[in-house]
Amino acid sequence: MNLLFLSTENPYPVDGGHHLRTFYVLKLLAKRYKIYFVGFAQDKEEFKYTPFIKPFCVSVDMFPVAKTGFNPGFLWLGGKNLFQKQPLIARRYFTPRACSRIEEILRDTDIDIVHVDMLALGMYARLFSDLPAILTNHNVESLRLFRWLKHEKNPLK
């Protein structure tokens, strides 16, 4: 069976919670499925880690996205996003090149199921609306924000 695996990051190196979870889910799924991995990288340095997930995948495609924080690329994206309906986090990962590659995989491969590793990748759902898909999330973001709000003293944050 063929599985399209969408991830906001390359899970390697396995050095934190997000990477741990994604890496081991990918590794476990690879025992049963042929994996077509599409991921994103904030930094050129991250591309050098693609060989570490290739043993689990038929194909690995990584696409650059704007790095989070105060840098020209992310600020430009944030400014443009003021005039968009979708949240910044979703727009950030929705790129024409990734869209084309996903369409190509879907056209050329008989994909049985799609694994969407984070809600931020939800804008791609229209490309595979006729396929079964699983959306996972790593955290309960509303709970994290609530806890942060209870402890933050600065009202401007």
Regions from the PLM with identified roles:
Residues 40-104, 108:
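A conserved catalytic-core segment of Leloir-type glycosyltransferases
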Residues 10-11, 42-44, 66-68, 119-122, ...:
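Short, solvent-exposed loop/turn segments at secondary-structure junctions
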Residues 29-30, 126-129:
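Short, conserved loop/helix-junction motifs that constitute active-site signature segments
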Residues 8, 72-89, 134-157:
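Acceptor-binding helix/loop patch of EC 2.4 sugar-transfer enzymes
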Residues 25, 100-104, 141, 156-157:
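Membrane-proximal helix-turn-helix segments that form the acceptor-binding/catalytic region
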Residues 12-15, 89-94, 111, 157:
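Short, flexible loop segments at the rims of nucleotide/cofactor-binding pockets, characterized by
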Residues 1-63, 109:
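N-terminal subdomain of nucleotide-sugar transferases
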Residues 102-121, 132-134:
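Short N-terminal targeting/anchoring amphipathic segment
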